[in-house]
């Protein structure tokens, strides 16, 4: 009746005879064989007031001396502790002088420190592997025994979080034994409603409470435990208490007996697939097992049945909600699938059209690129063919030279061999042959010199003609430094050509010279000014200048090669020589003028002199080239 009856009784220093609620049946069954010969007695505590037992859902006031226990406290007891007397410790002795550590001690300390650090590092790595995936992969892959340690830690964590998992249930079914309680015989005790303990194989004896009037005695069942070994392939049977059908009513001359109460059936939900419902079912079943084991099913039966009904209702509601959610989710998934199918069809159409467009564009670009590649390839082939042709020609020429040298060497070798063989008889022929070869070499050398001279002469002619062409083609004066440099490079060793080039005024080839048409145009302008100046006296005024300008336009001009030394005659002859291309005679005529006429024509004479110097130098160079060609002939 008292709550203290739920507490197990054990000898000080021994093990508890009742296991915890979550593991009561397997552990209790495994210890049954060791407890067959022992009897344990509950603590004799008399109730202070005869108060009726109260259900868990009602409020009751218990004694302060009685410790209230719960289902979690079942199977757990606290050993008595003895307080040791407190004594004042003696003062510590003075520390001994430090000794110098030996090599082996330092080695031992080093190894121990290394071992401790390694163990701490290994444990830290195992612990950190549970939080970091990257470190988990590194630790299990590269550290020895790291994977086994991490798996062991994860398994222990899983067992700690889910103690009633299926694996533990299978192990309990495989290792546990089945207890079959039995009730038989009669007891001399008076039926007092005390608890029928199932903690041990034999119930503990209790003293009969004192009463003024005698009470009828009732037979108290004496449960006995039998250890039944179950076969390996079959699961362990559940405890089967006796049913009411096995109860036999007492006879008239026998003391009264009450039928035993039916134990509470375990809760079972076939369609309970939710983890929460399964956990609730396991919890309720553990509670029912504890209540049945303590014989308190008469008091807690209605509450347990109510809890079972509530759990069944909750399971039904969860199942209905799950079905409703599944239907709703199926509808949403169906709508999403249709929407995705439509979107996928549209996307496929767009992708196909884009692919067709892209394919046509790529085909066009490919054709253009192939055309460019073909053209580049053809150009490259042409360049390569031309290069190969030149290389082949050079190789052929080199081969011919090598062959000529080889033939010459062979010839010389043959000659030497022949000379060695016929030295005495053909020494004269060898000398003649050597002289003939020397003559041929001299002749070949002479012809080479002739060819070089002819080539130099031709190049000299070409350079002179290039200078003349550059002077005659341009409408404006242009420098001809490059032509003169080329001409000097060709005739670098000829003193006549060098002297002719040196006689040319540097201003002429740096700025260029005027052409014949330019000289004639400039002469006409100069002639007008000279005519005006020829009509003026030495000390002329404004009127004289005006009259000379008028008379210069009114005077009749002469034609041809006019005779006389007057200014008009000289100008007429000069113009005639210019039109005929005789710059030398024209310059000589203009150089014969005096006074203002000569002063006005001084610049023109300078230009004509430059042209004549250049022409004279070119004539000298051309004459020298002809002379060299005649010398060669």
Curated annotation (Swiss-Prot):
Pfam families: Mitofilin. GO terms for biological process: cristae formation. It is a single-pass membrane protein. InterPro entries: MIC60. Residues 304-421 form a coiled coil. Residues 77-86 have a biased composition (Low complexity). Residues 205-220 have a biased composition (Basic and acidic residues). Residues 49-62 have a biased composition (Polar residues). Keywords: Coiled coil, Membrane, Mitochondrion, Mitochondrion inner membrane, Transit peptide, Transmembrane, Transmembrane helix. Residues 42-109 are mitochondrial matrix. The chain crosses the membrane at residues 110-130. It is found in: Mitochondrion inner membrane. Component of the mitochondrial contact site and cristae organizing system (MICOS) complex. Belongs to the MICOS complex subunit Mic60 family. This is MICOS complex subunit MIC60. It comes from Fusarium vanettenii (strain ATCC MYA-4622 / CBS 123669 / FGSC 9596 / NRRL 45880 / 77-13-4) (Fusarium solani subsp. pisi).
